[in-house]
Amino acid sequence: MRRVIDDFLPRGYFNEIKQMIEHPAFRWNFSSILPEGYHGQTEKDWYFMKRIYTENEHIEDAFGYWQTIRPMFYFFEEKLNFLTEHVISVNVNSMMNQGRKRAHGWHNDCPYKHYVALFYINTCNTAPTLFEDGSEVEHIENRLLFFEGGDHIDNRHSTNLPLDVERRLAINFNLQGSLF
């Protein structure tokens, strides 16, 4: 099950989130958590991320960000018919243009059953989200990609580095809940 919804948020609310993430005061953390050899990686991977929320608690220095992003859960319910029962994590990811096209390794965000909601902040014509079955979803501003994840299902995914923009911005929600 995969769902793609364009124009997921009303334009005003989307712009508020985008301006918050693109603001120079938004504090990023360097991450190299995808090591060489991870599900076929041939070299170390890195990107910038900001953890907003993890396991039912907001991150202290990200509280204002959490307050801005939290209303998105109402749209998950309204547009996806998805009721969030547990928030595993919410991260904002920034994949930088490194002058070459390269996909990260295939992975599930969590080994157990969960749902992934990838919300795209900007448009990248060269950086789709890829699935092992060969399908891909283009990275388009204000688009939400929603799918089931976990080791129990054949739905591993990967992302590409952008070539046409400075960075690829997305919010990654890992959730448990139910569709109705």
Task: Name each model-derived stretch.
Residues 67-70, 115, 140:
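A structural signal for well-ordered alpha-helical segments within the folded catalytic domains
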Residues 33-37, 94-99:
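Short, catalytically relevant binding-site loops at active-site mouths
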Residues 98-107:
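Charged, often glycine-rich, active-site loop that binds/positions anionic groups
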Residues 1-3, 12, 122, 177-180:
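Short, Lys/Arg-enriched, disordered terminal segments
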Residues 90-92, 105, 111-112, 123-180:
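Catalytic core of Fe(II)/2-oxoglutarate
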